[in-house]
Amino acid sequence: MASALCRTASRLRSVQLFRRIRVSSDLLSASSPSPACISDALRHGDFSLPRSFFSLNCGIEMLKMDQRCLLSTSASDTTSKHDSGKPETKSSEKNEKSGGSESSDGGSDHKNERASGKDVRGGPVSWMSFFLLFATGAGLVYYYDTQKKRHIEDINKNSIAVKEGPSAGKAAIGGPFSLIRDDGKRVTEKNLMGKWTILYFGFTHCPDICPDELIKLAAAIDKIKENSGVDVVPVFISVDPERDTVQQVHEYVKEFHPKLIGLTGSPEEIKSVARSYRVYYMKTEEEDSDYLVDHSIVMYLMSPEMNFVKFYGKNHDVDSLTDGVVKEIRQYRK
C-alpha cells in the first residue's frame, strides 16, 4: 500500500514538473530579448535585464528545485522500496523459519506420537521392563523351587537318619530298662542283645487293637524267618501294670506265638520304659467301673545291639512289615 502511494506521488510530481518546463519554455520563447536589444543595452550601458529574463531565471531555478525534489522523491521511493522489500524478506524468512519450526514441531509431535505409540505397543523401555520382570519372576521361581527341593532332601535325609542311623536311633528312642518276664525272671535290655527284636506296647484287656497287632506280628516273625533266615524275637510290654500280672501276661502271650516274650513291672518301671521309647498311654474310665488304656500303636525294630532301627505303625500289614524288616536286616549286614 505504501509503495503504491509513493508511485502515485512521484507521477504527480513528474506531471507538475513537465507543466512547469513547458511554461518556462513558453516564456523563454515569447519574451527572450533579441540580439539587437542586447547590443543596444550594451552600447548605452543599460545592464538591466528584461523581465522575461528574470522569469526565465526563476523558471530555471524552479526547474532545479523540481529536479532535486524529483531526485529526492525517486531516492525515497527506492529507499522505501528497498526498506519495504527487507521486511518482506525478513517476514518471508520468518515465515520460512516459522514454517520450518512448525514442520520441526510437527516432526517432533509426530515423533512424540510415535514414541507414545511405542510406549503403548511396547517400546524399548517397556520391553526392558518386561524382561526385567520376567527375569525377576523366573529367579524367584527358581529360588523357591531350589529351596523346596533342598528342604525335601533335608527331610528325607533326616528321615533316613532316624530310620537307619544307629546314633540317631539311640538318642531318640530306646534305653535301659529292668522288667519282669512272664516266667517270673527279671530281665534288662542286655538279655535281648545278640538278636533282632521287635517291641510292642499294649495291655491284656485290650478288646481289639492289641490282638490284631499281635497276630500280625506273629505272622511276620515266621515270614521273616523264611525270607531271611533270621530269628527275630517278638516282645510284648504291658502298659497296664495294675492288672497285668506276670501270670496274666504269660497266659496272654502264649495265645499268639510261642516265641513271644511278655514283660511287666511296677507302675514306675513301666512309666520309665514307656518314656524311653516315646510311648503314650493313659487310662480311660468306663461306666462299669472298668477301664481301658489308650496307647500308641507302634512296633519298634531293634538291632542286635538294642539300638533303634525303625518303627512300624498300624498302617503296615503282614507283607509290608515283613519286607520292611528284611530290608533293614540286609542293609545292616552290608
UniProtKB/Swiss-Prot annotation:
Cu cation binds at residues 206, 210, 295. Residues 74-120 are annotated as: Disordered. InterPro entries: SCO1/SenC (IPR003782), Thioredoxin-like_sf (IPR036249), Thioredoxin_domain (IPR013766). It holds the Pfam family SCO1-SenC. GO terms for cellular component: mitochondrial inner membrane; mitochondrion. Thought to play a role in cellular copper homeostasis, mitochondrial redox signaling or insertion of copper into the active site of COX. Plays an essential role in embryo development. It is a single-pass membrane protein. PROSITE patterns: THIOREDOXIN_2. The chain crosses the membrane at residues 125-144. The keyword Lipid biosynthesis does not apply. It is found in: Mitochondrion inner membrane. Keywords: Chaperone, Copper, Membrane, Metal-binding, Mitochondrion, Mitochondrion inner membrane, Transit peptide, Transmembrane, Transmembrane helix. One of its GO terms (biological process) is embryo development ending in seed dormancy. Gene3D superfamilies: Glutaredoxin. One of its GO terms (molecular function) is copper ion binding. It comes from Arabidopsis thaliana. Residues 1-13 form a transit peptide. This is Protein SCO1 homolog 1, mitochondrial. It comes from the Eukaryota. Residues 166-331 form the Thioredoxin domain.
